[in-house]
Structure formats: structure tokens, C-alpha cells
Amino acid sequence: IGIVDFRYILKKSNAIKILGDKFVLFEKKINENIKLKQKKLKIAEKKILSRKNKLTDTDYKNKLKLFKSEVFEVQKKYKEDRLLLNNSFQTLQKKLKDLLAQVIKDVSKKRDINVVFLKENVFLFNDTSIDLTNEVLDLFNKKTKSMSITITLNDKPF
């Protein structure tokens, strides 16, 4: 019998830390991009409103309609980027969890252990030699050491 603290490994592993840092970085870039576009849209809106009296009613309505479609496109792009980012990271997290499960299996086979329980589901264990957590964490870190994360938005690396 073996015991492993899956959550602890995910929390402490270098790969998950890198993934979290990258997620925050990409999220920040998306937010900075939307803020920049919002500033430009506010300027464009003020320009349209300031010219209201100088334009014909039809021209004003056309400019307003065009402006609203630009706002819609910016909002749509933001939602798409967020969705892509979230889906990418969920996919990466799943792959890392699957790899971690394989590492646990490899360690248990190497130590001739037939059953491994999650530490959170075990009430008490007195023999700490059955705790595979640190060994699994070390091996998981080694297997993910050369991992790189790149996300592409609209065919451009982020």
C-alpha cells in the first residue's frame, strides 16, 4: 500500500507554478490590450459626440452605428481571447494531472506497490515509508523540467 498527496504535489510542483505564472501573465496582457482598446474607443466616442451638431442626422447615426459595431467587435474579441486562454490552461492542467498520475503509477510499480490511496482519503497511517509524495514530486519535477508553455492568439505567439 502507498499513499500520495496529489494536491500537495500539484501545489508544490514547478510545472504548476510555471503554468500559474504564465496564466497570470497572459491574463494581464489580455486585460492591458482591452484597456488600450477601451481608451481608443472612448476617444472615438467623444469625437463622434462632439461632432453631433456638425453632422447631418444620417451621418451621425451611421457613425454611431459603426462605433457600436466596433465596440461589439472589441467585446467579442476579449471574450474569445479569455475563452481561448481558459480552455488552453484547462487542457494543460489536465495533461499535467494525467502525467502526474502516470508518475505515481511508475513509482508504485518500481516499489512493487499494488494500491495507492490519496492522502486526503486516509484517516491514519503510522508508517511514513508508504508515503510516496516526495518521491513522486521529485520525479514529476524532473519529467516536466524542460516543459515550455506557449499560447497562440490569432496565429501570433502570446
Predicted regions and their residues:
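Amphipathic, charged alpha-helical segments and their helix-to-coil junctions
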Residues: 1-158
